[in-house]
């Protein structure tokens, strides 16, 4: 029998296969919430933390401060699919990486505030997001301007 608190958790993105449709369904209930907050909500999908949030949303070219309701189910599914792919690539341990370039940064945006974007050259920014004030790294040119919140 499952503990009642475990029943509230979203699908495990490292399950084989992960239930991405359930993650999208749970994300939909957060219509006005910022996608950067929603992807880290463990009752939506389990496993996405700060690094994977910033890296996934960058690779999917989504504004982390946009409302989840502004995105199609297909785009949301793409976010969860990308996150699970990045997490699977890093199952073998540290150092964790989402970008593979000799002698370069292991990340596209995470921890790179003030540095140039590898894709377009714009300056990577960091803003606090959500009630917990978690850091969110993003490229304002590749991902669109941040919205208030």
Where are these regions (language model features)?
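Phosphate/anion-contacting hairpin/loop surfaces
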Residues: 1-48, 52-61, 67
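Short metal-coordination and nucleic-acid-contact micro-motifs, chiefly zinc-binding Cys/His arrays
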Residues: 41, 110-114, 135
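Short functional micro-motifs and their immediate structural scaffolds
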Residues: 53, 124-126, 147
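A broadly conserved sequence feature marking short terminus-proximal activation segments
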Residues: 57-111
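Short cysteine-rich clusters marking metal-coordination/redox-active sites
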Residues: 117-120, 139-142
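Low-complexity, intrinsically disordered Gly/Pro/Thr-rich segments
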Residues: 118-128
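Short linker/helix segments within small regulatory modules
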Residues: 128-135
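Short metal-binding segments enriched for Cys and/or His
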Residues: 143-149
């Amino acid at each position: 029998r499952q503990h009642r608190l475990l029943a509230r958790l979203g699908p495990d993105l490292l399950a084989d296969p992960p239930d991405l449709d359930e993650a999208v369904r749970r994300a939909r209930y957060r219509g006005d919430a910022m996608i950067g907050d929603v992807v880290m909500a463990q009752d939506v999908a389990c496993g996405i933390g700060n690094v994977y949030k910033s890296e996934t949303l960058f690779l999917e070219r989504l504004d982390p401060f946009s409302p989840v309701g502004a995105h199609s189910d297909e785009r949301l599914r793409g976010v969860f699919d990308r996150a699970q792919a990045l997490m699977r690539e890093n199952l073998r341990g540290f150092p964790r990486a989402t970008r593979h370039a000799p002698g370069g940064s292991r990340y596209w945006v995470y921890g790179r505030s003030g540095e140039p974007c590898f894709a377009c050259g714009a300056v990577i920014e960091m803003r606090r997001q959500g009630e917990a004030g978690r850091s969110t790294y993003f490229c304002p040119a590749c991902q669109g301007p941040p919205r208030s919140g």
